[in-house]
A protein has these predicted regions:
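Short hydrophobic beta-strand element within catalytic cores of glycosyltransferases
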Residues: 23-26, 42-43
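Active-site donor-binding loop signature of nucleotide-sugar glycosyltransferases
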Residues: 44-48
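Short glycine/proline-enriched, acidic/aromatic patches that form the donor-sugar handling elements
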Residues: 10, 30-35, 49-57
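Active-site helix-initiating loop/hinge in glycosyltransferases
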Residues: 9-11, 28, 105
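Aromatic "clamp/platform" in nucleotide-sugar-dependent glycosyltransferases that forms part
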Residues: 4-6
Length: 144
């Protein structure tokens, strides 16, 4: 898979693709860096540049944001390298697939979310039943 994105977010398509044990060439920027390491995938260098004013979209792409621009020559060299040494990159891809299946399984993600909630969500007080004393008020008579 080749993904030269300017800003992927978490990069779920890349994570899912890593599970099929095929080589990945991707931008060395954004959320995919959490699970695509330099030893087992090919990360293409580049630079952050401010978002062009014509790309600004209210509440989506805000002024002052930056995009990652991969270097074309790095991307071309990466593609040639994988083609030339495909067997080596296929072995690395299998290792990456195993690593990501282990570290990003449903159980691991559930455990990580549990830790985040435990560490950052306050313990809310439980509602208790009020035990008020009975008031012995005089009985009122109805007036016609």
């Amino acid at each position: 898979m080749i993904s030269l994105t300017k800003g992927e977010g978490f990069g779920r398509p890349l994570l899912e693709f890593s599970l099929v044990n095929k080589p990945i060439i991707a931008s060395a920027w954004s959320g995919q860096i959490d699970f695509l390491d330099r030893e087992l995938s090919i990360l293409v260098g580049g630079e952050l540049k401010p978002l062009h004013k014509s790309s600004v979209q209210e509440e989506v792409l805000v002024e002052g944001s930056s995009w990652f621009f991969p270097y074309d020559n790095h991307a071309m060299a990466a593609m040639k390298e994988v083609q030339k040494n495909y067997d080596k990159y296929r072995v690395n891809a299998k290792k990456l697939g195993y690593k990501n299946r282990t570290n990003f399984s449903f159980e691991k993600m559930k455990e990580a979310l549990g830790e985040i909630l435990t560490n950052h969500v306050p313990v809310f007080p439980k509602q208790i039943e009020l035990m008020l004393p009975k008031l012995n008020l005089p009985k009122l008579e109805k007036i016609d």
